[in-house]
């Protein structure tokens, strides 16, 4: 097994001891956008100009304490658009934001840590070893929801050799088994995929599969993935 952690350098929670609104993204009118949607409570967004510092600080501390990582998942960097910041002390364009996010991934790789993030975006392909997933749009909706259009497997096949993409393996209904899409794309399987929140990110109740059966299904997909 490989050992990695789930980490985050965008959601900037006000309850954090290190929170400083001067490092939060500002709009041109000098207001600081934010919300309280996630479990961490009120938050704004950390300006990505600051992210490399915190990545290096935190991972250096982990190493100092004897924690050796094989991989790290920097959440949301690749599934959210680039941020902008109008703070005159650290002005940032969206292009700049992608560069700073890329610097975080590059630093991980320089330390021998496999880099990962939520989905895949074209700007991030040079920096990622694997991702959380890259599902088709309909996989993020309940199984009975009508499909919209025809999915184009850009990252799943065109960039197949560039990024390892774990696939959902849910048997969502008697007529739909996502394992078949994993086989079709020669992708990697997801053995256990628990959503952080109910009914979000494709984490719906479907056909229940035992761990033993899911392990066997994953073995089949893995054997094909190793050949592609």
Segments (PLM) and residue ranges:
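Substrate-binding/active-site clefts of carbohydrate-active enzymes
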Residues: 2-53, 137
């Amino acid at each position: 097994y490989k050992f990695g952690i789930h980490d985050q350098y965008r959601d900037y929670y006000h309850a954090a001891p290190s929170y400083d609104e001067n490092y939060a993204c500002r709009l041109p009118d000098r207001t600081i956008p934010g919300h309280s949607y996630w479990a961490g409570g009120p938050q704004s967004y950390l300006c990505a100009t600051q992210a490399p510092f915190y990545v290096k600080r935190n991972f250096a501390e982990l190493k100092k304490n004897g924690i050796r990582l094989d991989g790290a998942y920097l959440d949301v960097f690749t599934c959210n658009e680039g941020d902008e910041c109008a703070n005159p002390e650290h002005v940032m364009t969206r292009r700049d934001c992608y560069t700073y996010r890329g610097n975080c991934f590059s630093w991980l790789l320089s330390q021998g840590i496999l880099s990962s993030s939520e989905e895949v975006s074209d700007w991030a392909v040079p920096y990622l070893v694997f991702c959380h997933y890259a599902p088709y749009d309909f996989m993020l909706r309940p199984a009975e929801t009508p499909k919209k259009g025809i999915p184009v497997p850009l990252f799943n096949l065109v960039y197949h050799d560039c990024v390892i993409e774990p696939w959902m393996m849910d048997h969502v209904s008697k007529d739909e088994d996502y394992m078949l899409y994993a086989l079709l794309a020669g992708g990697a399987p997801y053995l256990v995929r628990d959503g952080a929140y109910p009914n979000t990110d494709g984490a719906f109740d479907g056909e229940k599969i035992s761990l033993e059966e899911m392990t066997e299904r994953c073995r089949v997909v893995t054997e094909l993935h190793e050949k592609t």
